[in-house]
């Protein structure tokens, strides 16, 4: 991972590109294949095209991230690929857990996948949380919040993860307003 390479002072240009290739596969190709197999394949070529658009958007997002200088490290420009992949995974998890299927579920999946692709290549601001310092003393309230989130997740993991990932996805347009 790029962050580990920077911490250990082993970063290189090759490593940066290799890391991006791994990210395209993990956060672009894999979720696109998952949502395609989940339901987009039922609509034929449009489903294949939407899955391809998701992969292309992830690749473009990562390429832009590699070449553009950081303006404000507190924000990403566009939805980060791992979060787009997490929204796909959480959405499918909820749909599978609730036995949601059929034409309307596939239509929602198609629209959501396109919206995620657009968010990745957009210039919408998304919090990076890089300004949070967790190396020093962490306030007690922050620890309580972490415990609360884990307890909340334990009640209904699919829905809680879907809510958290969707809230982050929607935060970009809300920060833009």
Sequence positions of predicted segments:
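Hydrophobic, membrane-facing alpha-helical anchors
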Residues: 1-6, 53-67, 107-126
């Amino acid at each position: 991972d790029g962050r580990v390479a920077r911490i250990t002072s082993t970063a290189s240009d090759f490593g940066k590109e290799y890391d991006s290739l791994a990210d395209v596969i993990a956060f672009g190709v894999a979720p696109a294949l998952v949502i395609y197999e989940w339901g987009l394949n039922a609509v034929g070529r449009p489903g294949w095209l939407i899955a391809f658009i998701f992969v292309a958007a992830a690749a473009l997002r990562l390429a832009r991230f590699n070449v553009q200088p950081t303006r404000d490290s507190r924000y990403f420009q566009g939805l980060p690929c791992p979060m787009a992949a997490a929204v796909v995974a959480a959405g499918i998890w909820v749909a599978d857990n609730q036995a949601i299927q059929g034409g309307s579920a596939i239509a929602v999946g198609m629209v959501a996948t396109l919206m995620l692709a657009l968010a990745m290549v957009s210039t919408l601001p998304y919090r990076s949380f890089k300004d949070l310092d967790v190396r020093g003393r962490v306030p007690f309230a922050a620890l309580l919040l972490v415990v609360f989130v884990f307890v909340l997740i334990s009640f209904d993991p699919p829905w809680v993860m879907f809510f958290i990932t969707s809230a982050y996805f929607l935060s970009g347009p809300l920060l833009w307003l």
